[in-house]
Design a protein with these regions (language model features):
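Anionic coordination/interaction segments
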Residues: 1-208
Length: 208
C-alpha cells in the first residue's frame, strides 16, 4: 500500500486510495497479499502515524519485507532548502538509532550544549521510526536508497530487499526502514511507521 506503487503490472496489482477527515487510507492487493496503510496525525500530537496492516490470503506461509520511506527537506526554511542548496546540504546528516532514522539540521553544532544558541542555529532533529517490528535494514541517504540509474519506480534498496544500512552526511537526507515478517495463511500483521520533528529522546518515547 503506497502513494506511489513500485512499478507493478496493473493487471496483477490493484490499489484504492480514500481520503477522509484527518486521514488517508490506501489499500492494495498483489500476489495474494492484501495491505492497508492508514495515514493520520493523532489528536493533540505533532507527528504522523503510518499504520500498515498486511494479510496473507494465500494458502501457504509467506516471508515478506515491509519498507517505509520518507524524504526529508534539508532545512525548515523554504528559502534555505530550495535556494541555498550548498548550505542546506552541508548542515544535514542522518543517524540510525535503534528503531529510527534521525535527521539532524545543523548537526555540525551537536557538540554545543543543548540550550546554548549559536547564531540562532540550534540543532533540529526529525525522525522516521518503526514500531511493532525490528528494523532489518535502513538508509538515510536518498541517492543510496534510489541507486544509480534507478528511480522511485524501482529504488535499489527495495529491489534488493536490503536498504544497505547507510547514513547521510552533507547529502540529500531520507528515512527508509525495512523489517522482515513471516505470515501464515490467513494471518494479519500490523506495524507502524512514525514521522515527526522532535529531539531524539522524545522520538524514542513516541515510538516505544
Amino acid at each position: 500500500a503506497s502513494w506511489q506503487p513500485v512499478g507493478k503490472d496493473l493487471a496483477q496489482y490493484k490499489s484504492e486510495c480514500r481520503h477522509g477527515i484527518g486521514y488517508t487510507k490506501i489499500s492494495a492487493d498483489y500476489s495474494d497479499i492484501h495491505s492497508e496503510a492508514l495515514y493520520y496525525v493523532p489528536l493533540g500530537k505533532s507527528y504522523e502515524v503510518w499504520a500498515l496492516s498486511v494479510t496473507n490470503h494465500s494458502d501457504h506461509e509467506r516471508n515478506l519485507t515491509l519498507s517505509g520511506y520518507a524524504e526529508f527537506t534539508n532545512h525548515s526554511n523554504y528559502e534555505q532548502d530550495q535556494v541555498n542548496l550548498q548550505y542546506s546540504l552541508f548542515i544535514s546528516r542522518t543517524l540510525f538509532e535503534g528503531n529510527r532514522i534521525t535527521q539532524q539540521i545543523h548537526g555540525n553544532l551537536d557538540a554545543i550544549p543543548e540550550n546554548e544558541n549559536v547564531d540562532e542555529k540550534n540543532v533540529t532533529e526529525r525522525f522516521f521510526g518503526l514500531a511493532g517490528a525490528e528494523v532489518s535494514s535502513y538508509c538515510g541517504d536518498k541517492n543510496e536508497f534510489l541507486g544509480s540509474y534507478h528511480g522511485y519506480g524501482n529504488p535499489e534498496g527495495i529491489v534488493c530487499g536490503d536498504l544497505g544500512d547507510k547514513t547521510s552526511y552533507n547529502e540529500n537526507s531520507c528515512g527508509a526502514l525495512s523489517c522482515k515478517i513471516t505470515l501464515k495463511a490467513g494471518e494479519t500483521r500490523t506495524i507502524a511507521f512514525l514521522l515527526g520533528m522532535k529531539p531524539s529522546s522524545e522520538a524514542a518515547e513516541v515510538i516505544r
